[in-house]
């Protein structure tokens, strides 16, 4: 008898799992439910559509429902899962265009419900000039605003990953951009001295960064904070995301930090036969050993692949995360992996940090730019615990060398001895990673 796999969520984790399971077991009847208009899309590319670097959101779609159908996966679009009956092995779904509800039976279940932009209870946050950025379906109205934003006042609430990328997008459109951050710097995980380099980059493109200011209210033409008011024709939220786990919680699945779903290393939840992956889940941090909520596209795809392998009858294990990430703001690149000093100390390590200043290429090469690297290590053993980079073009992807070292529990001394490449257009003789 043909077994049926139901997948809730049609983006990275869900469709990675669906595709992997179908490849491993072609006999599986795979049905996916997606409440939106798109499947398998690259949400990380949204800021570059808004900034005009990418022509259309359609370019961000890796595989359409029709293409999934060609591979034997039936995707039900604009169909939302609204209730799980895990005891009865069934899912209640609602067709959003008709309101019709029905129960769908399953033999295996994959939950990939993703995350939603944080929307704190601020007066005016539901006004029509306030937008969140997470899903392609939300982009068209925001893109219209971006395309006519030259000379207008745009306020970005939050100076995290998405806020920094949006700052570049709207600045390139000619908008007057103000970023509001409740903390004392942009990208709170960065060491303070590297964060100052980022601040300089933000201000160099004409963006105002206002730190230590909490938003009190959003008006029709301004945003009020604890320190004052700023004109705002358009407000965009960049406060991070929260996992979409109400279905999982109601079904009795164990939740962890930030309310993310807890799974074992096979991506199985606390309910046998039910798997989960992606931005709705937490993951084990390889350095701290603790569960952490770090929603990244790389993690979603990797977890989805593991879940799909196991749903398809295989035996795969998810090895954990480091939280490795890169981003850029015009000429400034940022890379980070592992724990910063405060996080390492909180995790119980006797940790120290060292920051060095170097160049992206040989110092005499015409494209050479400054790069600063902070390395965090355990005192005594020298084991690497984290690495943070801020610098010019060619800086950020150096973080992958550090991530590889962290993944394999290398010491700072061992990393310094690695035979890294050298040519004047690419690095100094001693690469900044080796020096740090």
Regions found by a protein language model. Give the residues of each.
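Glycine-rich dinucleotide-binding loop and its adjacent helix/turn
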Residues: 111-173, 208, 263-265
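A Rossmann-like FAD-binding core segment of flavoenzymes
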Residues: 27-29, 69-97, 104, 172-263
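Short hydrophobic core segments
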Residues: 8, 104-114, 230-240, 304, ...
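Beta1-alpha1 glycine-rich phosphate/pyrophosphate-binding loop at the start
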Residues: 2-74, 167-190, 404, 422
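FAD-site-proximal beta/loop scaffold in flavoenzymes
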Residues: 126-150, 221-224, 229-306, 401, ...
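Rossmann-like dinucleotide-binding cores of NAD(P)H-dependent redox enzymes
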Residues: 60-61, 153-155, 161-216, 296-299, ...
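A conserved FAD-binding loop/helix module that cradles the flavin
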Residues: 263, 277-340, 427-435
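Flexible, glycine-rich terminal cap/loop adjacent to redox cofactors
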Residues: 8-12, 20-27, 35, 329-337, ...
